[in-house]
From Swiss-Prot:
Broad class of where this protein is predominantly found: cytoplasm
A GO cellular component entry from the record: cytosol
Catalytic residues of the enzyme: C81
PANTHER family membership: PROTEIN YCHN, SULFURTRANSFERASE TUSD
Family: Belongs to the DsrE/TusD family.
GO MF annotation: an example: sulfurtransferase activity
Role: Could be part of a sulfur-relay system.
UniProt source species: Vibrio cholerae serotype O1 (strain ATCC 39315 / El Tor Inaba N16961)
Enzyme Commission (EC) number: 2.8.1.-
Record's keyword terms, sorted: Cytoplasm, Transferase
Domain of life: Bacteria
Listed InterPro entries: DsrEFH-like (IPR027396), Sulphur_relay_DsrE/F-like (IPR003787), Sulphur_relay_TusD/DsrE (IPR017463)
Family annotation (Gene3D superfamilies): DsrEFH-like
Protein name: Sulfurtransferase TusD homolog
Length: 131
């Protein structure tokens, strides 16, 4: 069977719901089965997954590091919706500079993108799965 290409859409934050964790586990399973995960688009409260300022307890899985490892190991694009991110205080270095902010908190391996990026994924990937 030919491997399928996927994009995941994550609407839930790291904490408070299981959607982000389930998306991560699904992403790992896809890759283990030989499919290709092209990107993960974080939307609505899901953009909070891209914040570098979360500090989980020592005995908890660090979901941010999990996403970053996935991006590094499998060339997965991690994209936060720029509009949703700015509204929730997740700011890239470029956006911080543009808006005159003293600091930024978008985690390494995450980028900010518009909804056009998600629309492109809808056209190009074999499957888009929302969490």
């Amino acid at each position: 069977m030919k491997p399928l290409t996927y994009t995941l859409v994550v609407n839930g934050p790291q904490y408070g719901t299981q959607s982000a964790r389930n998306a991560y586990l699904f992403a790992k399973a896809l890759i283990e089965k030989g499919h290709i995960l092209k990107s993960v688009f974080f939307y609505q409260d899901g953009v909070l997954n891209g914040s570098s300022t979360h500090v989980p307890a020592n005995d908890e899985f660090n979901l941010l590091q999990g996403w970053q490892s996935l991006a590094q190991s499998h060339q997965v694009q991690l994209e936060t919706c720029v509009a949703a991110a700015l509204r929730r205080g997740v700011v890239s270095e470029q956006e911080a500079s543009q808006h005159g902010l003293a600091s930024h908190n978008l985690a390494a391996h995450f980028t900010q993108a518009g909804l056009g990026s998600l629309a492109q994924a809808l056209l190009e990937q074999d499957r888009v799965v929302q969490f």
